[in-house]
Structure formats: structure tokens, C-alpha cells
């Protein structure tokens, strides 16, 4: 089933991917049923979303484009931009740009405490991202988590605030985890996000390997109807 084009517009700049909100609108169309696939038209292309029953709840999972791995960023430079010390950033994992449609620099931070202390100077951050960088946004992650079942604790802070759940970034993080050994190929892992924004979210991700390429990036979560209404245009 093909739905109408679905996108999301942010002030000043469009955040092109459908984020974790992709499964919600698909669920809300009434077309989403267990073991069914819905095809969404987003700005990054056609995104298939599949639904299945898990423990009596509807779980939606979208497949993103195969990832492109970009540049490695300097720890000291990034730390200075976001109000951290270079020692707050993990030295055993790279700060690397990954894109499945929107390019994120995945920034591995050592602890939840360091993540809570982020202070982005937007003038210099935008200058960096819009200058020589191949990333459009930063996605901050740490292997220290609040939930023992989670693999990463994440924050996505951008020019208009903080996003509690960023599916486009989580997909990039899934590819990054598989590429750098944080997750095994095809292992479904949990990313917790939105805790600092007091809107905790649970994003399930996985990615496969085909030869030396990361592929089959999947991002999902449980879709629950909380409101029903009509829009008159």
C-alpha cells in the first residue's frame, strides 16, 4: 500500500528524514496491521515500514537506505564546539559521519554525566557543520545507559531544541555500531533517547553486513494510538 507523501518541516531548515515519527503516522492511517507493509514517500525516498505483533503490541520497523560512511572528526575540535573536554569523548571509537539520507556525525561520549553537560555554541557549531564538515547534525551517544537492556544512551540537540527520538540518526548509529564492533551484524539493539528532555524514548535498531559493506539498516519501535481526529483542508 502506498500512502501520500509524508515529510516533516522544521523552521529555517528541513530535517529531511522521517525520524522515529515515521512509524506513528503509518500506524495512524489505519492501513497498518500486523504482518503488513506500508510504503511511505519521504524526502529521502521511499521508505517501507513493516508491522508485526510483539507481546500483544504493534511493532513498526522501517528500512533505511544503505549507509554512506564519511569523514572522521577531530576529538578536540568537536569537544570544544559542544562544551566538553577532549577526555570526555571516547578514544576507542571514532567520531564519524554516517548518512542513510541525512548525515550525522556520531559522537561517542564516555558517560551519561558528560552527555548531560553538553553546551553547544550554535554560532560555531553551525559554522563547522556548514563549512568543511560533511555532517548536517551531531548525534551524541554513550555506552553507559540508564536501562541495562540498552546498548546506547543518546541525545540529539539541534538548532531548534532537543529531539526525544531521532530515527534517522538512530539508523546511522546502528550502521556505525556494526562497522565499529559495538553491535553484531543483524543484532537488534535498543537505543534510549529523550531522557534529558523528559520525553524518554526507546528506539530499536539493527544493521547487517554483506561482505565488507553495512546494509539492511532497520529502525523500529512500538506504535500506540493516543489520539484520533480529522483534518479539514
Please identify what each model-predicted range represents.
Residues 1-233:
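Active-site proximal loop and beta-alpha junction motif in alpha/beta enzyme cores
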